[in-house]
Amino acid sequence: MVSLVLADTADSSDLSKAAITVEESTSAQQPKFFNYHEFVITKYRALDEESCEEHGPENPICITHFPNIYVPEESDEFRTTRVVRIPRRFESSTEFPNFSTQLPGSEPAALPDTHNKEFVPAGEFEGQWYGETSVSPLSNYLDQAEWTEIVTRINSLLEAAYNPITRRNFVNVILDLLTLNLWSIIEPYLFVNPLQSVEDYVSEINRSESFRLKGIKIIPPRESSYLSVCIDSPAWIKPCTAINEPLLTHCDTLIVLL
């Protein structure tokens, strides 16, 4: 990052007389990446409380999982699943979608964690449990190595699919010219879209024994317009009024890549 500093001059309106110095920012001043999907709230029901109370900015909880918008709102799956959203990394590439390989809570600017990267409920908000840190329920199902392997593969498939310099694209351009753009209408019905490789890989992961046993799945990125990766996971449900029930209610899990 570069900052410009204007020194005092006799005539401040005359910028040509202003002395401009360039100061290189230190690494500590550089922007740090965080999961921009998450946010904090201060009014919630803590574990030892019977009603929702205001806790102030010193004791917030972090919203790290969200309603499953990929199923009908009136369905059982909507009630029993939640979505963990994984953000894009625009500093890595703007030419094609590139998603974060870091589990929520592991990002440089994540809210600090003292529970060894495990999701630990601290408060209830709108019938769902949330923790005090950026760690999401996803960390209770996948470790960093597993997640990195999955997202790295997705990113590499997306890079290959969005690469404009390929033999297929070259042939398509020639045929479009020869057929007055009719080829671009016919071609999708004759050949598989390169992005289908991403969908096939996601389907393969969702069918894996590990994902089936854990009750989690990746939402195909196409459903989120490649804006994020979403994970479908079990809901962490506990109504405000049910303070004597078990801490967690286990349901099907949703993992989404956004």
Swiss-Prot record:
Top-level lineage group? Eukaryota
Q: Do the record's keywords include Translocase?
A: no
Keywords associated with the record: Endoplasmic reticulum, Membrane
- Topology versus the membrane: Peripheral membrane protein
A Pfam family reported for this protein in Swiss-Prot or TrEMBL: Erf4
PANTHER family assigned: GOLGI AUTOANTIGEN, GOLGIN SUBFAMILY A, 7, GOLGIN SUBFAMILY A MEMBER 7_ERF4 DOMAIN-CONTAINING PROTEIN
Q: Which family does it belong to?
A: Belongs to the ERF4 family.
Report what the protein is called. Answer: Ras modification protein ERF4
Supply the source organism for this entry. Kluyveromyces lactis (strain ATCC 8585 / CBS 2359 / DSM 70799 / NBRC 1267 / NRRL Y-1140 / WM37) (Yeast)
